[in-house]
């Protein structure tokens, strides 16, 4: 059956589900890392902020309004609930979700209509970062889904063409000889199928330091942009290494 674009009702369910999942994770993370402040974890480990009306921008805003309403009150109340329910993850998740829910609902239509997630993707489902390079010889790239509601793996030529376009652009136009990407997909055989042995040979150490971005959280979102089943909660209690930064080196001519 041909996959259909998600409806606004499905998008609302996705937002509810992913925010609940992030609250579930946050509870366990903070209990394991009591040295980290609740506000820091809420802002940096998960991306609930971007899904609320506190976010005045698009999917990836350039400005953050953490110090004004409505975020101040929501963050403060959620922190109080964590202290109250530090030993009861379900109670915290349910109560904290109700704190954010009205603000999620307020932003729902704007969030559903936002198509900016693919802005700047020069190579279909792949974009490179040229400006923020630490190593001038290496270009890091990011992955999205330009063929939603299909999976990027449905057409075997799609990712191949995206990656070939990336490599051609990086080598000929940007003058670099390496590309790198840190992503949960580096543990997916379907993804690794597109890469030569050099990609595996230049693997760096796995990284389990969870942050808000889709390099981690993307694995919990379906090709249609909906939530994946709730069994992932067991995964989040004992997360495996999700990100492996692997590099491919262009051979000398």
Please describe what each predicted stretch is.
Residues 1-154, 169-178, 186-253:
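Non-catalytic substrate-recognition and accessory regions of acyl/acetyltransferase enzymes
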Residues 154, 158-165:
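Conserved acetyl-CoA pyrophosphate-binding loop and the N-cap/start of the following alpha-helix
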């Amino acid at each position: 059956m041909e996959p259909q674009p998600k409806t606004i009702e499905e998008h609302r369910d996705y937002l509810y589900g992913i925010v609940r999942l992030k609250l579930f994770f946050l509870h366990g993370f903070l209990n394991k890392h009591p040295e980290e402040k609740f506000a820091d974890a809420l802002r940096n480990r998960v991306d609930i902020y971007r899904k609320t009306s506190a976010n005045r921008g698009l999917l990836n805003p350039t400005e953050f309004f953490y110090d004004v309403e409505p975020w101040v009150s929501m963050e403060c109340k959620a922190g109080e609930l964590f202290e109250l329910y530090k030993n009861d993850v379900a109670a915290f998740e349910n109560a904290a979700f109700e704190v954010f829910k009205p603000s999620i609902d307020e932003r729902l239509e704007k969030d559903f209509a936002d198509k900016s997630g693919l802005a700047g993707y020069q190579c279909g489902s792949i974009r490179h970062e040229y400006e923020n390079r630490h190593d001038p010889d290496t270009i890091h790239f990011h992955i999205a889904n330009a063929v939603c509601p299909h999976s990027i793996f449905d057409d075997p030529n799609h990712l191949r063409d995206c990656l070939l376009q990336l490599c051609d652009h990086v080598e000929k136009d940007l003058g670099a000889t390496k590309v790198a990407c840190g992503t949960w997909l580096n543990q997916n055989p379907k993804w690794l199928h597109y890469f030569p042995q050099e990609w595996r040979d230049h693997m760096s150490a796995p990284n389990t330091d969870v942050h808000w971005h889709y390099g981690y959280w993307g694995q919990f979102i379906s090709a249609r942009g909906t939530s994946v089943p709730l069994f992932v909660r067991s995964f989040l209690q004992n997360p495996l290494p999700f990100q492996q930064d692997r590099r491919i080196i262009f051979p000398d001519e």
